[in-house]
Amino acid sequence: QCAVIEFARHVLGLADANSSEMEQTAHPVIDLMEEQKGITAKGGTMRLGAYPCVLHKGSKAAEAYGKLHISERHRHRYEFNNDYLAQFEAAGMKAVGVNPDTNLVEVIELENHPWFIGTQYHPEYKSTMLSPSPLFVSFVRAALDYAEKEQKQNK
């Protein structure tokens, strides 16, 4: 969520962009999920558990998982506000993972970055020492590749 807010403020120029969880704003790029808006007693009403996500073919996330259909665990009430999706995508932040039932954005990537993936879900919830999240493995691999490239260039 913070990556989306930062991008909105400093790339899209929406200086007051924020999450409606933090403050009321003219640009709630992260907003309360529609099904949560009528709920006044919030206890026990979060989006909890595993939900499906369809990854875009050719995305870094799809490459990391090695498949297009995944299921990851959630714990939240706030989501990317799809009213801003066209602006984000035109500026280079792509929604590359979407819930097929609700059209909620689950995964974002920066198109011209060696490895920038943001998720709405919590990949750490299903990750273990013996079976780490594919995103964690992909991130470490990308960092190692980057370090190796830098070492070769600086010799």
Predicted features by range, described:
Residues 1-8:
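Catalytic nucleophile loop
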Residues 9-155:
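Amide-donor transfer/coupling interface in amidating biosynthetic enzymes
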